[in-house]
């Protein structure tokens, strides 16, 4: 394996070298690779959000690398490039979804050489791509982590505008902390993800999927939470090893939920969910039962054993099921948004 692994590390180094040659708008946009000198049991492939960059997965990537996984966070096509981009000279983002689909398939192939099982994950449009992989290749993908995937806009009017207006759009939060990506884009570049979101939502109704973790937030005003809930409800019927968690509004976790740098003061909670989901094979029913046991006062040490987790992760996960984190009556793990009955 040593030779193969070295060959792959050389390929990853070439990717970063070519990024340096073409010129990136910020060092934070560079592809991130956290790779051990050997093949690991699982390899994680993470896909950043639209107009953003790999920096969104640095905290989670480092954590999972330290847990013994290989981690790949490649820069997506047309993203992160240096240039004076504006409405007269928009960034060169693809307007054909094939560019992204071919890209993710290429990286799944690379990932397979670095781990026995491939875990995929993504934020926003990256989550949409991860959902597509989970549905199209359920035999090849071990599981998919969907962090507030873009399956539609919260405001239906935006869906309509994105489908019809070929305009340049600037992000409302373009100068927000941690925004190292593009400040704007031409709408057709986003339209292709809206269409992909509609496709995966439709396919989930009668198509088996790899296990998925759906993470959403009540404070996310960008994307449709009801569509995320519908997607999860459809998937879990055929894939019982899927989980759902929605952060309460009181935590103020917005759409860019992966890092403290991007205004999520609770980044460790996102990391906790990811670690727990990747490390166990519990079904949705078992996950709910454990949550009910937490509410009924079961010690986190017992949770630690059942989930096969380190003490800190067990403590966080236990706390996340309580009203202290806004999870009244376990509504945070109910895709219908109401409390879960805590009586067996």
Which residue ranges define each predicted feature?
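Short glycine-enriched nucleophile-adjacent loop
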Residues: 127-138, 144-145
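Catalytic histidine neighborhood in serine/cysteine hydrolases
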Residues: 72, 235-257
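Active-site nucleophile loop of the alpha/beta-hydrolase fold
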Residues: 145-156
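Catalytic active-site module of serine/aspartate enzymes centered on a nucleophile-bearing elbow/loop
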Residues: 253-344
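Short alpha-helix in the alpha/beta-hydrolase fold that links the catalytic acid
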Residues: 60, 210, 224-235, 244
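Conserved acidic catalytic loop of the alpha/beta-hydrolase fold
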Residues: 101-118
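Short beta-strand/loop motif that positions the catalytic acidic residue
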Residues: 208, 214-220
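Short, surface-exposed "cap/lid" segments of acyl-processing enzymes
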Residues: 25-79
